[in-house]
């Protein structure tokens, strides 16, 4: 194996191991994985905000909500992929 490949494998191993070492067992209780959505929600609730309107339809469960989100992401990815492929093919035909 060439030296270049060994260096690349070492870098990949470091990239994989480093987050596991830094994590050090801190969990959600300590707020390690708290996101900006959670922090924003807490601030809004502290202010006593009342929503102006309610959603027309709410998914019956979190799984269905996740399914709808995944479908939306998949449809968007298909549309973006189609246009990228279309313009690449158009450019190749023109060349």
Swiss-Prot record:
InterPro entries, sorted: CbiN
Disulfide bonds: none
Transmembrane portions of the chain: 5-25, 67-87
GO biological process: cobalamin biosynthetic process
GO MF assignments: cobalt ion transmembrane transporter activity
UniProt keywords, alphabetically: Cell membrane, Cobalamin biosynthesis, Cobalt, Cobalt transport, Ion transport, Membrane, Transmembrane, Transmembrane helix, Transport
Associated pathway: Cofactor biosynthesis; adenosylcobalamin biosynthesis
Pfam families (alphabetical): CbiN
Membrane topology value: Multi-pass membrane protein
GO cellular component: plasma membrane
Protein location: Cell membrane
Subunit architecture: Forms an energy-coupling factor (ECF) transporter complex composed of an ATP-binding protein (A component, CbiO), a transmembrane protein (T component, CbiQ) and 2 possible substrate-capture proteins (S components, CbiM and CbiN) of unknown stoichimetry.
Family designation: Belongs to the CbiN family.
PANTHER family on file: COBALT TRANSPORT PROTEIN CBIN (PTHR38662:SF1)
Function: Part of the energy-coupling factor (ECF) transporter complex CbiMNOQ involved in cobalt import.
Record's protein name: Cobalt transport protein CbiN
Protein species of origin: Methanocaldococcus jannaschii (strain ATCC 43067 / DSM 2661 / JAL-1 / JCM 10045 / NBRC 100440) (Methanococcus jannaschii)
Recorded name of the encoding gene: cbiN
